[in-house]
From Swiss-Prot:
The keyword Iron-sulfur does not apply. The gene is dapB. It comes from Cyanothece sp. (strain PCC 7425 / ATCC 29141). The keyword Cell division does not apply. Its EC number is 1.17.1.8. Catalyzes the conversion of 4-hydroxy-tetrahydrodipicolinate (HTPA) to tetrahydrodipicolinate. GO terms for cellular component: cytosol. This is 4-hydroxy-tetrahydrodipicolinate reductase. It is an enzyme of class 1 (oxidoreductase).
């Protein structure tokens, strides 16, 4: 099932929008091999995942049981990597299970709480097992966040707007929360009040993140993934925006994460940490 010397990869959530792109990218990478594909879609069980994603047969059946694949992977000379693009309700258990079987997780599913991330870090440390948790695999988004950090030196007012397709289950997005966290870690408080505000509808001013940063979430069909970071000062507005037009833009980051996680022994959060 594996190519000699290649990193075995299990794609969890393989029939989803992101999972399909990961399957294609892994199948085309010479130093990776698709060890297994997992998805709970009952209509696709047993089908060749290559046929499901439209690239021809890969001789890898789509299965529903993640644990059985992790058991099989643990018996390989190199246990490899599990890439998880599933659901906020299942990702925590998926990651713990992978670590327990010696398979390194690369996590693209958002929705993990800070407490869950800390618990996974403790679990991974005890196992000396690498794990990457990455809210956004886009190089462009990393550049936007770096530009926002630089801009925050000169602006005291900032708000974040994130826009996603209406199938996204969590809000705010992990990327927006990460952006707010990066700005909050700079040691300043944003958006000093100019007036006493009254919300006539609950949530009209968005959700309040750390250090006074507000995040607004939009969910509509037709969107993929978009984020604006808007800075304001008297007489000027500075807007940073990143737009995703195709999910293939995430694949260079996913492939980099698969390769990098093999040399880690703890949890690392954010693509910028491995660039």
């Amino acid at each position: 099932m594996t190519n000699q010397g290649a990193i075995p990869v299990i794609v969890n959530g393989a029939a989803g929008k992101m999972g399909r792109e990961v399957v294609k990218a892994v199948a085309q990478a010479a130093d990776l091999t698709l060890f297994g594909a997992v998805d709970r879609n009952p209509s696709l069980q047993g089908q060749d995942i290559g046929e499901v994603v439209g690239i021809g047969p890969l001789e890898v059946p789509l299965l529903a049981d993640l644990q059985s694949l992790l058991v099989a992977a643990a018996q390989e000379p190199q246990a490899g990597v599990m890439v998880d693009f599933t659901h906020p309700n299942s990702v925590y258990d998926n990651v713990r299970m992978a670590i327990a079987y010696g398979v390194r997780p690369v996590v693209g599913t958002t929705g993990l709480s800070p407490e869950q991330i800390r618990d996974l870090a403790t679990f991974a440390d005890k196992a000396s097992m690498g794990c990457l948790i990455i809210p956004n695999f886009s190089i462009g988004m990393v550049l936007l966040q770096q530009a926002a950090i630089q801009a925050s030196q000169y602006f005291d007012h900032v708000e974040i707007i994130e826009l996603h397709h209406n199938q996204k289950a969590d809000a705010p997005s992990g990327t927006a929360l990460q952006t707010a966290q990066l700005l909050a870690e700079l040691g300043k408080t944003y958006n000093p009040p100019a007036v006493k505000e009254t919300e006539h509808l609950a949530g009209a001013r968005g959700s309040l993140a750390e250090e006074g940063i507000r995040i607004h979430s939009v969910r509509l069909p037709g969107l993929i993934a978009h984020q604006e970071v808007i800075f304001g000062a008297p007489g000027q507005v500075y807007t940073l925006r990143h737009d995703t037009s195709d999910r293939s833009c995430y694949m260079p980051g996913v492939l980099l994460a698969i390769r990098k996680v093999m040399n880690l022994e703890t949890v690392v959060y954010g693509l910028e940490k491995i660039l």
